[in-house]
Amino acid sequence: MAAAVLSGPTTGSPAGAPGGPGGLSAAGSGPRLRLLLLESVSGLLQPRTGSHVAPVHPPIQWAPYLPGLMCLLRLHGTAGGAQNLSALGALVNLSNAHLSSIKTRFEGLCLLSLLVGESPTELFQQHCVSWLRSIQQVLQSQDSPPTMELAVAILRDLLRYASQLPTLFRDISTNHLPGLLTSLLGLRPQCEQSALEGMKACVTYFPRACGFLKGKLASFFLSRLDSLNPQLQQLACECYSRLPSLGAGFSQGLKHTENWEQELHSLLTSLHSLLGSLFEETETAPVQSEGPGVEMLLSPSEDDNTHVLLQLWQRFSGLARCLGLMLSSEFGAPVSVPVQEILDLICRILGISSKNINLLGDGPLRLLLLPSLHLEALDLLSALILACGGRLLRFGALISRLLPQVLNTWSTGRDALAPGQERPYSTIRTKVYAILELWVQVCGASAGMLQGGASGEALLTHLLSDISPPADALKLCSTRGSSDGGLQSGKPSAPKKLKLDMGEALAPPSQRKGDRNADSDVCAAALRGLSRTILMCGPLVKEETHRRLHDLVLPLVMSVQQGEVLGSSPYNSSCCRLELYRLLLALLLAPSPRCPPPLSCALKAFSLGQWEDSLEVSSFCSEALVTCSALTHPRVPPLQSSGPACPTPAPVPPPEAPSSFRAPAFHTPGPMPSIGALPSPGPVPSAGPIPTVGSMSSAGSVPSTGPVPSRPGPPATANHLGLAVPGLVSVPPRLLPGSENHRAGSGEDPVLAPSGTPPPSIPPDETFGGRVPRPAFVHYDKEEASDVEISLESDSDDSVVIVPEGLPSLPPPPSGTPPPVAPIGPPTASPPVPAKEDSEELPATPGPLPPPPPPPPPVSGPVTLPPPQLVPEGTPGGGGPTAMEEDLTVININSSDEEEEEEEEEEEEDEDVEEEDFEEEEEDEEEYFEEEEEEEEFEEEFEEEEGELEEEEEEEEEELEEVEDVEFGSAGEVEEGGPPPPTLPPALPPTDSPKVQPEAEPEPGLLLEVEEPGAEDGPGPEIAPTLAPEVLPSQEEVEREGESPTAGPPQELVEEESSAPPTLLEEGTEGGGDKVPPPPETPAQEEMETETEASAPQGKEQDDTAAMLADFIDCPPDDEKPPPATEPDS
């Protein structure tokens, strides 16, 4: 009749039309449909007057279909809602009527099952007690097993819902549960399984109310522990494991926790006793239970020896399951687990092997039972791992030894079978691999699996054996005539061919009976355990293990895809193929640090795996490809390399802009990436012609800033003099002619600039002499790892500074940092730095550093270049023109945040210090003194100083050439041919600058700082004669600083500094003492001049090379140490 109700309306009205007979409106279709369905079922059981559906069959004929009808009604969600209360009430009446009759009891229970699950709360509370009474009557009636089973299922639902309602919970606990348990205990043996189901529901939902019957329940459960029915035995174990929670807080004078622990110890004692009975005289040193537990009183067994062993085995199995369930089941209170005692039992069981069993008498029977006992022990170990988790790590070594021990015990006879047959002991090995996966899943890399040792090697051997597909036993044999099985010796003209001997018992694969999925379970378990271990412990696994896995997995995947191993191998199963791909992905995601992952081969394999017949396998391969693609080709660039290092160029006031430019965001973006080896990017726009001195490719090595002596002369860009600048030495920008400075910058600027855009050119009027000088870049052949680690936010004096072309001469030789996004002026190359601190500022400054000879005082225009904080490294000299371009033009890769913060504060101090330094230099040389005054005036005297700067540049070039020829001849070859930059800032000091290295000079404060270190170190005899005495001390101080940080000789120190810019920073800090960035207002040219004047007399005495090195080293510390250096120098 339900079909008739759901059928369409009669002709004359469209289906579903509101007015059609039988039609359901859209608004009320759901409730009305449910009502019609309920009435339809009621009509099937008993005709009802006024029903929309007329009865067609007697109710009894529908009895066999009622369970299915109840399921269909649940699918429609018939119950619930006020609209259905009337229909549900009718069903309640029908159910009660049918339950009262023996003939219709089953139909009444079917209706009651629907009512209990679908009735609303009010209806359930109203009828729950009456339904419980009806169920109890059914249990006492000793009806047929199907009826009893349905009644117990309804009882379980009733107790589950009633336990959620406090009123019903109290009522049932006090008045009804004792009678229900008594009825369940009295069921006949045929209904024992139903009785155990009902008892399990009672002890689960009403544990306190069951406490008064705890003794009877325990006896009932124990008597069923050795049942031969697996389902009955499992139910008895589950019920017994819940006994400790029965009763109130105190059960028979014991707390729940104490009761649980006592029960656990009793189980352990009983298991030890049973094990001793099973394998008496087979254990060499049996472990006895030392716990406080008392052995359980089990029913006596029969006298027959064979039967006794089987009954003992059943009891042992049941008690072991009870122990595992107690460990894995939830308990209402925290308890203490005797881990050591449980592990002792497990080790005792697993320690019994076939070698210990005497095959006489009952030995074969004991040997037959042994695998089952080992499985019980492994289940117990699994439950213990789940219960205790990572707290078992102290026993990790024991667990790591147990697994390969069990595999060794059950590995005999596995290779003698032909393909297509299940190997023996596969179930035990599957369980071992499942425990391996669980142990690694719980403890991660701390599990220590496959990380060396004899146990790890043994485990790996078993894993590879179970993963490898079996091979048909084909042997090469000689012709029949050969007696020794070797090749027949005969005429050389008639060689004999080897033939395949398949053996007598081995037929061709097409003629053999076999299981195509044989050993698929153990193979899949081994693959899962191995893939989990590699994924969690891959980097800790030995390199040799990774290579062995690569050699096995990659060819196996290819063979599976080509169908070469699918004949009778476990890889016929899609589950094994899926786990094989999962293992391949784990090898990619967690490779060994010394063994590269097989990425290209894996990508090919995953691509082909997408065409697998199994949807599960193909879907996993697609997901693996997505994962690999995200790793190899990220759609979003990594954070460190994303975005330009410098913000868009913006005009900034010359003196104060540097601090703002140094915003952390600027440092974070691009400078770090640029520090790494810099491939020569597109040429950076430069004002002057770019001489082809050194290969731009050398710029890649630029990032590494280490002492030159340690490295072979880098073939990097030529200095301003046209000499190739060795990787260790950089020429001060003031000394470098603008055109040559641009030489390297044009090629490297894009690379150095995070944005990769060439720096915009600055109007000629903003540059010195109306033309844009080009900075010379120092390129290093070798890139140090520490160089890559240099960050924009580092506090080191070693920094790469990119100055816009528009800036006045960029005195800061220390930083030849790549220009940020698009520096305007041609980049200036940092002056050659002494071996010690050379690395700090070597970062090529492709950025538009103002004329590499930044010594000219003109701070005019955006002299400050504040953003990159070139100021601390000589921004005043180089940052004259581009206050607006600070963000893009000046990048201080190694600059420190402290210097940036202190720049503004020290700007005034640096100016004063520069003035003092200039006065001292005036005493040494009148030209330098005039240059100092010009630097103070910067913009006003800028043009006048250009002529002097050009002359000085020529002298400096000559000195630099000599210096490079002496020490850096190899490096000097690169850019000697470079034409001297046409435009030099007027205030550039003469040839001494290479040694003085304007890095400290860029800002007067830096010069002071350099002078302070110099004073500490003492005057350096190596400084060029043109350099002021202050510069010499600073250079020596720099050298001392390089030496002090590194215990090794100065060359070693230089190498260390070049490799690790942070060490350079420290040196700079020591030498400079002040990381305060010199104010952009102070002309970098002034600083450079002062340094050159101070170092000039001493520099003449020193070797030109040594002077250049010392000067370059002094520059970074000078940035940090403002005026104090000058006094010591003097």
From Swiss-Prot:
**Low complexity bias: start-end ranges:** 7-16
Q: Which GO terms describe its cellular component?
A: cytoplasm; euchromatin; MLL1 complex; nucleolus; nucleus
* GO terms, biological process: cellular response to estrogen stimulus; positive regulation of transcription by RNA polymerase II; rRNA processing
**What is the residue range of the motif LXXLL motif 6?**
264-268
Find motif (LXXLL motif 11) and give its ranges. Answer: 585-589
Q: Where is this motif: LXXLL motif 1?
A: 33-37
In this chain, composition skew of type Polar residues spans 694-704
Chain positions with Phosphothreonine modification: 757
Q: Which residues carry this modification: Phosphoserine?
A: 13, 478, 482, 761, 1034, 1044
The UniProt keyword set, sorted, is: Acetylation, Activator, Cytoplasm, Nucleus, Phosphoprotein, Repeat, Repressor, Transcription, Ubl conjugation
Q: Which cysteines are joined by disulfide bonds?
A: none
The GO molecular function terms of this record are: chromatin binding; SUMO binding
Q: How does it assemble?
A: Interacts with HRS, RXRA, SUMO2, HDAC2, RB1 and STAT3. Interacts with PI3K, SRC and EGFR in cytoplasm. Interacts with ESR1, the interaction is enhanced by 17-beta-estradiol; the interaction increases ESR1 transcriptional activity. Interacts with CREBBP and EP300 in a ligand-dependent manner. Forms two complexes in the presence of 17-beta-estradiol; one with SRC and ESR1 and another with LCK and ESR1. Interacts with histone H1 and H3 with a greater affinity for H1.
Tell me the domain comment: The Glu-rich region mediates histones interaction. The Leu-Xaa-Xaa-Leu-Leu (LXXLL) motifs are required for the association with nuclear receptor ESR1.
- Name of the protein in its database record: Proline-, glutamic acid- and leucine-rich protein 1
| Organism name | Rattus norvegicus (Rat)
